[in-house]
């Protein structure tokens, strides 16, 4: 029963988000939030404030982020070099990402892109959620098989499930971001 409670809490969160998409809510602000989160996640994953800017691995950041968000090659500004704060780089890349998406919007009629956002979000959410359910089942079986000594298996399940849920959320954000930046306009030419 406690295992089911964990699953139900996660299900409620996902179904609430899914319902927003299905109800036809304008998802643009949510999508922009996902894009900003994706940028921040990749930057913080690759670059640490503990290193001076000249040691930041921009090649790795370019390799990780640019296939998802097609920005220009990432180089540090003079201000970022002097501040040494990763947050400054994150803020600039987030601004550039939003500007790039606003440029992408001009390729579409407004209602068309809003519908594309909904379709992509729904497909990604559904696929990632189904994968997550399978992963949670495997986790439950694995925790049941392991001896946790003095640890409560339900607590371990909740903690691992929370981490997996966060990973799924990041994957939804990243895949949605990449799909929206790479969607193409096709025009039929009538003869």
Regions found by a protein language model. Give the residues of each.
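Extended, charged helical/alpha-beta scaffold domains that provide interaction surfaces
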Residues: 1-191
């Amino acid at each position: 029963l406690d295992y089911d409670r964990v699953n139900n809490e996660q299900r409620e969160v996902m179904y609430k988000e899914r319902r927003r998409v299905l109800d036809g809510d304008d998802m643009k602000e949510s999508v922009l939030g996902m894009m900003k989160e994706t940028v921040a996640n990749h930057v913080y994953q690759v670059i640490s404030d503990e290193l001076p800017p000249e040691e930041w691995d921009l090649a790795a950041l370019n390799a990780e982020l640019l296939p998802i968000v097609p920005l220009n090659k990432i180089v540090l500004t003079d201000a970022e070099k002097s501040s040494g704060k990763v947050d400054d780089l994150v803020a600039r890349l987030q601004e550039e990402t939003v500007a790039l998406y606003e440029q992408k919007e001009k390729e579409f009629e407004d209602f068309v892109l809003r519908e594309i956002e909904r379709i992509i979000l729904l497909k990604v959410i559904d696929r990632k959620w189904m994968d997550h359910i399978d992963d949670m089942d495997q986790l439950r079986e694995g925790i049941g098989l392991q001896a946790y000594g003095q640890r409560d298996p339900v607590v371990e399940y909740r903690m691992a499930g929370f981490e997996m849920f966060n990973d799924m959320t990041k994957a939804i954000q990243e895949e949605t971001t990449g799909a929206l930046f790479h969607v193409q306009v096709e025009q039929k030419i009538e003869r």
